[in-house]
């Protein structure tokens, strides 16, 4: 465990260093870039799926299952035969099983210039016994003792100071325990490096202007892939690729299709390793122009093209290059012969590179690139072939077989090219033998024996990869045993009954079965037979069949026997009464079940209703089972319900047989709900309904009732019908006296002599047809309004009685004593008032008014005629004798006399007020209602002059304002609190004294003082007023009193003094000079002080 922990810590640290180095682009690569582990599942290149076995808590989130010991041949026995259950096998570490891969080694690319000098190839398996590990390189086992650089920690193979010459190659992990061995996928160890360019000076390349040129990179030795770029003159001025210049990532060369004077200079090839990020620069290659003239135009010459055959793995990205020299600069185009270039393809580098991401099988085909200019064209064709790694379609399952049985295993994989198959046994290639055949992924072994047990692997491979599937073969070989299939020692049956005595011994090979009765072998006949599974069957058992029966199982490894006694009894008979009974809901009944049986057998009674057992505890006390005698039982059914109707069963069970009988119980009750209610026809006040009959519950239906519900009704209401009485044989009727244009639901209720049943399901909601309104408004009256207005009010008609759309009101009125009516339309159905204004109408003129209704169907009735008066005028006189009196610092009393004569009766008065420095139009107002003749204005500012006016108002408006009056609020009360409080308690009273309060210039004069006192815990204080600087406060009740003093003036009460707490005490004398208890605030010592004050002391 310690070594495993160290390895995990080592790998974690190196991974952290890796991520850190990647975040610092300017630094050389550390171990972070050294190991590039290629993720690959076992279904991809070299992948191998581990066999599902069972879930191990030590493996974290590893998902696996128990062994699938599925039989693949004849005479298969379930794994339960060996392990009792698969769950038990998971937990039982005493069961041996072969190795199962948890982790297989991954491909590694190791940088040769790494500071970290170790390579770790991981391998982890589980099995029982715990497997051991060996490693192979290029198919040969590695001797760990042969090189000090090798070490093995658990299954992880570690190479210190790895060397490309010694250590590169293909590695496999071989895991072995006593069950067998399995071989892992091949993991490739590759070394990443980048050599230096040769230091030789490169010759200058001299061309004519307009000529094409190729500058060779000639990269140094490297592994794996490298990326090419070119520097022009000096770093970091890189050559920009365009339609004229191209850098091939296949050759590394720089191609210039048409040289210009601006191209003259020095060129340096820069290569970068894709793993280590190391970079090296080539010696410069000078490019010069010849002085023998400009190159003439010529047709394209393709210098860079993709191979004749391009191979790519499915799902990867394919890049095909094509670039040409020429003058003028050629244009590159692409096409797919006999097809279309995939829509996902992209053209890069001025169309010199065709890139196909996520390549699929249907992307394969012949591709052509074409270079063309004004002088001609040239083209190249090559074929793209897409291959796929092998992928499992069907894998192996662990299997157990009896010795001598045939084995057939088949594994199937897909891939392109089509995979071929090889088989391994315990990590070693399996060869055909006399009993062993291998054909196209099928392994067959005839007559398996113990030597065939072990671990098998199917290897599917094509030229691009290989995958492994593993399975364990167990060969069973054991003597017969009845340990898991014991027989009953005594089998009891009744006469003429069929008997099957089982005999199922466990053993491998499968045991042969023989039977004896007593000491004589059982002879088969028409009535007695040995079944294929070894059981003994006896038809029409009789007393002569009684006795001891012996079953014997035997194979090459031994034999075993088991004995059972057969006893034949008389058959049981049963009688259930009464057989058929009719009851009414609420009645009770007793069913009696009597059994005639063999006296040696005990009987048990079971009751059922409609084939289901009766639950006596859950049936609400309706059922009770009564067992008065050993051979009979009663079922009491109390207060029977409709749901209790049906067939009741009584079953009698003995150890030998089981018999049953049934009785039918019919229950009469109120009818069931009628069927679906359908509205056949609808008018403005009727609805014709039909329904399917209700179940009569064994009592004929006498009548039906129709019920309706609308948004305006209180629940369901019985409606009038035609015919008035709906007899039980009817299935339709008409509901009448419905309101027009109202949505209704209907339901039907059935009644029989026993009672009324449940209602039917409501019908769909339906609206009656429209009709002319029939209901006139009520409570027509007048309302107060403004001068020259006639206000007519009424109670709106409910939507239930509007009878259709477009509902409104017709308001008719005329001066009292005249003949012609004036009518006005009010279109709102919710309106309750109409105002008619006429400047010629004097106040309080009587009018006759009536209000009618209408809708889209026509006009309805008018209400009764009532007489109302037009609005009175607004008050015409102003209040008189208005006075304003200051009450306090924030209050002023404004009073006035009522108006004696006015054209309009006042409903109240409005008082307007504003400060002396403000305008009247900014005045605030306060309204009174009724006959009040004064108001106290509050919330005013102290020592401030205010102006006031008063005017009357009613529904017609406001009257003229009164004359303006003024008043000044009183000064603020003193802000200084009484100080230097002195007190003396004697008995049940306290004498207080304090210093006088001197008001400030803007404060009102002190009139006197108020002493507030209350018992602690009470909210209401009592007050003593005095003009003196002392007062006597009574303390009538026991307890602590809280006292404070305030000065008061015409401006109100001033600031309170600090509170004092005084206990009521009948003896002794306490003064403020002798007490430290001056304030209401308490501390942890307050209780102690209070107790001290309650102790008499003559020294006080």
UniProtKB/Swiss-Prot annotation:
An example Gene Ontology CC term for this record: presynaptic membrane
Covalently attached lipid (GPI-anchor amidated serine), positions: 1072
Region (Disordered): 959-982
Annotated signal sequence range: 1-18
UniProt keyword terms in alphabetical order: Cell adhesion, Cell membrane, Disulfide bond, Glycoprotein, GPI-anchor, Immunoglobulin domain, Lipoprotein, Membrane, Repeat, Signal
Tissue specificity of this protein: Expressed in brain and kidney and at very low level in placenta. Not expressed in other tissues. In brain, it is highly expressed in the occipital lobe, amygdala, cerebral cortex, frontal lobe, thalamus and temporal lobe. Expressed at moderate level in the cerebellum, substantia nigra, putamen, medulla and hippocampus. Weakly expressed in the spinal cord and caudate nucleus. Weakly or not expressed in the corpus callosum.
GO molecular function, one term: cell-cell adhesion mediator activity
The family this protein is said to belong to: Belongs to the immunoglobulin superfamily. Contactin family.
One Gene Ontology biological process: axon guidance
Removed propeptide positions: 1073-1100
Domain Ig-like C2-type, chain residue ranges per copy: 99-190, 196-282, 300-385, 390-474, 480-567, 571-660
The protein's name: Contactin-5
Cysteine pairs bridged by disulfides in the record: 123-173, 217-269, 322-369, 411-458, 503-551, 593-650
Composition skew (Polar residues), residue ranges: 963-982
Heme in keyword set: no
The protein's role, per its UniProt record: Contactins mediate cell surface interactions during nervous system development. Has some neurite outgrowth-promoting activity in the cerebral cortical neurons but not in hippocampal neurons. Probably involved in neuronal activity in the auditory system.
SMART domains: FN3, IG, IGc2
Subcellular location: Cell membrane
């Amino acid at each position: 465990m310690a070594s495993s922990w160290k390895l995990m810590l080592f790998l974690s640290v190196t991974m952290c260093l890796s991520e850190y180095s990647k975040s610092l682009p300017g630094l050389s690569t550390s171990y972070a870039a050294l190991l590039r582990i290629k993720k690959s599942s076992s279904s991809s290149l070299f992948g191998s799926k581990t066999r599902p076995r069972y879930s191990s808590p030590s493996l974290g989130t590893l998902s696996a299952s128990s062994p699938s010991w599925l039989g693949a041949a004849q005479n298969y026995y379930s794994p339960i035969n060996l392990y009792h259950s698969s769950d038990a096998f998971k937990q039982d570490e005493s069961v041996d099983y072969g190795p199962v891969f948890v982790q297989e080694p991954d491909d590694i690319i190791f940088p040769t210039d790494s500071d970290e000098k170790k390579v770790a190839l991981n391998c982890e398996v589980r099995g029982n016994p715990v497997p051991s590990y060996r490693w192979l390189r290029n198919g040969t086992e590695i001797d760990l003792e042969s090189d000090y650089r090798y070490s093995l920690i658990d299954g992880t193979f570690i190479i210190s100071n790895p060397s490309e010459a010694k250590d590169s190659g293909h590695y496999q992990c071989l895991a072995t325990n006593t069950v067998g061995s399995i071989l892992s996928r091949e993991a490739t160890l590759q070394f990443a490096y980048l050599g230096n360019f040769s230091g030789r000076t490169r010759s200058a390349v001299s061309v004519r202007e307009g000529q094409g040129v190729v500058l060779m990179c000639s990269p140094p030795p490297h592994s794996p892939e490298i990326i090419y770029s070119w520097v022009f003159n000096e770093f970091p001025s890189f050559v920009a690729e365009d339609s004229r210049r191209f850098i091939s990532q296949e050759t590394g060369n720089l191609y210039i299709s048409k040289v210009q004077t601006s191209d003259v200079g020095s060129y340096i090839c820069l290569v970068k390793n894709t793993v280590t990020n190391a970079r090296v620069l080539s010696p410069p290659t000078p490019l010069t122009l010849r002085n023998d003239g400009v190159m003439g135009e010529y047709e394209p010459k393709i210098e860079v093209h993709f191979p004749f055959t391009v191979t790519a793995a499915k799902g990867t990205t394919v890049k095909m290059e094509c670039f040409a020299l020429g003058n003028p600069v050629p244009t590159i185009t692409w096409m797919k012969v006999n097809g279309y270039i995939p829509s996902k393809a992209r053209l890069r580098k001025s169309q010199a590179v065709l890139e196909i991401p996520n390549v699929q099988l249907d992307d394969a085909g012949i591709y052509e690139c074409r270079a063309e200019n004004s002088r001609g064209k040239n083209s190249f064709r090559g074929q793209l072939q897409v291959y796929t790694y092998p992928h499992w379609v069907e894998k192996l399952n662990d299997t157990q077989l009896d010795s001598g049985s045939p084995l057939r295993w088949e594994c199937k994989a897909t891939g392109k090219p089509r995979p071929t198959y090889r088989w391994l046994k315990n990590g070693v290639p399996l060869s055909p033998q006399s009993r062993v055949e291998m054909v196209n992924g099928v392994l067959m072994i005839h007559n398996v024996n113990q030597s065939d047990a072990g671990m098998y692997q199917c290897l599917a491979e094509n030229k691009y990869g290989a995958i492994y599937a593993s399975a364990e073969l167990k060969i069973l070989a054991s003597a017969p045993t009845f340990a898991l299939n014991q027989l009953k020692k005594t089998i009891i049956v009744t006469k003429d009954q069929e008997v099957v005595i089982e005999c199922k011994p466990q053993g491998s090979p499968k045991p042969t079965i023989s039977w004896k009765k007593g000491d004589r072998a059982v002879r088969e006949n028409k009535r007695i037979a040995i079944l294929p599974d070894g059981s003994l069957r006896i038809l029409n058992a009789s007393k002569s069949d009684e006795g001891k029966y012996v079953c014997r199982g035997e194979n090459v490894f031994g034999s075993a026997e088991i004995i059972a006694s057969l006893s034949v009894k008389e058959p049981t008979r049963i009688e259930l009464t009464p057989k058929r009974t009719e009851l009414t809901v609420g009645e009770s009944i007793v069913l009696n079940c009597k059994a005639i049986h063999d006296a040696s057998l005990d009987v048990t009674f079971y009751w059922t209703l409609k084939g289901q057992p009766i639950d006596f505890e859950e049936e609400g006390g309706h059922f009770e089972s009564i067992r008065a005698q050993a051979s009979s039982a009663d079922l009491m059914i109390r207060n029977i319900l409709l749901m209790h109707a049906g067939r009741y069963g009584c079953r009698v069970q003995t150890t030998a047989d089981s018999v049953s009988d049934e009785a039918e119980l019919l229950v009469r009750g109120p009818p069931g709900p009628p069927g679906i209610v359908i509205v056949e026809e609808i008018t403005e006040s009727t609805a014709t309904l039909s329904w399917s009959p209700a179940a009569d519950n064994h009592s004929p239906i006498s009548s039906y009732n129709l019920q309706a519900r609308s948004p305006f009704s209180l629940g369901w209401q019985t409606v009038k019908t035609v015919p008035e009485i709906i007899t039980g044989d009817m299935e339709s009727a008409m509901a009448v006296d419905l309101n027009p244009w109202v949505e209704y639901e209907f339901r039907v209720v059935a009644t029989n002599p026993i009672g009324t049943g449940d209602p039917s399901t409501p019908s769909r909601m339906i609206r009656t047809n429209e009709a002319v309104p029939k209901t006139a408004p009520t409570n027509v009256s007048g309302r107060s309004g403004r001068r020259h207005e006639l206000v007519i009010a009424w109670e709106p008609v409910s939507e239930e009685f509007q009878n259709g759309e477009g509902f409104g009101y017709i308001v008719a009125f005329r001066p009292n004593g005249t003949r012609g009516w004036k009518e006005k339309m009010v279109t709102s159905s919710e309106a309750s008032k109409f105002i008619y204004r006429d400047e010629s109408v004097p106040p309080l003129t009587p009018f006759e008014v009536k209000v009618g209704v209408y809708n889209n169907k026509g006009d309805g009735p008018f209400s009764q005629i009532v007489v109302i008066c037009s609005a009175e005028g607004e008050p015409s006189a102003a209040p008189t004798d208005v006075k304003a009196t200051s009450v306090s610092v924030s209050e002023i009393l404004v009073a006035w006399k009522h108006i004696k004569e006015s054209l309009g009766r006042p409903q109240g008065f409005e008082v307007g007020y504003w400060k002396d420095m403000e305008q009247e139009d900014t005045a605030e107002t306060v309204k009174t209602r009724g006959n009040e003749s004064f108001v106290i204005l509050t919330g005013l500012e102290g020592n401030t002059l205010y102006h006031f006016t008063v005017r009357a108002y009613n529904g017609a408006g406001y009257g003229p304002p009164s004359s303006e009056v003024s008043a000044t609020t009183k000064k603020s009360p003193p802000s200084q609190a009484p100080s230097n409080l002195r007190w003396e308690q004697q008995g049940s009273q306290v004498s207080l004294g304090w210093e006088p309060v001197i008001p400030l210039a803007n404060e009102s004069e002190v009139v006197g003082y108020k002493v507030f006192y209350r018992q602690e815990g009470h909210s209401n204080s009592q007050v003593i007023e005095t003009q003196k600087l002392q007062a006597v406060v009574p303390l009538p009740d026991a307890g602590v009193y809280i006292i404070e003093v305030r000065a008061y003036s015409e401006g109100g009460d001033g600031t309170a003094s600090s509170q004092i707490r005084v206990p009521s005490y009948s003896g002794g004398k306490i003064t403020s000079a002798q007490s430290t208890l001056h304030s209401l605030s308490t501390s942890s010592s307050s209780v102690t002080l209070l107790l001290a004050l309650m102790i008499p002391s003559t020294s006080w």
